[in-house]
Amino acid sequence: MKIMVINGPNLNLLGIREKEIYGAKDFNQVIDYIKEEGKELGLEVNCFQSNIEGEIINFIHNAYFEKYDGIIINPGAYTHYSIAIYDALKGVEIPTVEVHLSNIHKREEFRHKSVTAPACIGQISGFGEYGYIMAMNALKNKIK
């Protein structure tokens, strides 16, 4: 089973940015953790990151053309306003789980709404990097 993990804006700053919210592990440590756990689950996991909305949309399109079985996406701040990412996810019809390291519902009011989550089979929020592992398990069980 082939899974694409897409990380949006500022996630490359993990370990630097607001450690009390996002944790002390740097981006590469989190990616290594995701890949190791994916391998344990018998998944082929490829990870991508961009601060640019159009590149994120291209990753989603590529997931379709490269025949990925599932997508895990942390759209970062695009969560709250990117209709374009929502449309891309709806357009490819690949089972997708939205992940957030922090609990977006316990943060600033503007972070409470996700416009991208309705295009996903589920949302995992507030479990740190373990949320990606939860998402991989969810996809593995959903896709079978």
UniProtKB/Swiss-Prot annotation:
Binding site for substrate: N74, H80, D87, L101, S102, R111
Pathway(s) this gene product operates in, as recorded in its UniProt entry: Metabolic intermediate biosynthesis; chorismate biosynthesis; chorismate from D-erythrose 4-phosphate and phosphoenolpyruvate: step 3/7
Keywords, alphabetical: Amino-acid biosynthesis, Aromatic amino acid biosynthesis, Lyase
Transition state stabilizer, annotated site positions: R17
UniProt KW Lyase keyword: yes
InterPro entries reported in the protein's UniProt record: DHquinase_II (IPR001874), DHquinase_II_CS (IPR018509), DHquinase_II_sf (IPR036441)
Gene Ontology molecular function terms on file: 3-dehydroquinate dehydratase activity
Keyword Aminoacyl-tRNA synthetase: no
This enzyme's EC code(s): 4.2.1.10
Record-annotated active site: Y22, H100
One BP term from GO: chorismate biosynthetic process
Reaction(s) the record says it catalyses: 3-dehydroquinate = 3-dehydroshikimate + H2O
NCBIfam families: aroQ, PRK05395.1-2, PRK05395.1-3, PRK05395.1-4
Quaternary context: Homododecamer.
Reported function: Catalyzes a trans-dehydration via an enolate intermediate.
Family the UniProt entry places it in: Belongs to the type-II 3-dehydroquinase family.
Protein's name in the database: 3-dehydroquinate dehydratase
Biological classification of the source: Bacteria, Bacillati, Bacillota, Clostridia, Eubacteriales
Gene that encodes it: aroQ
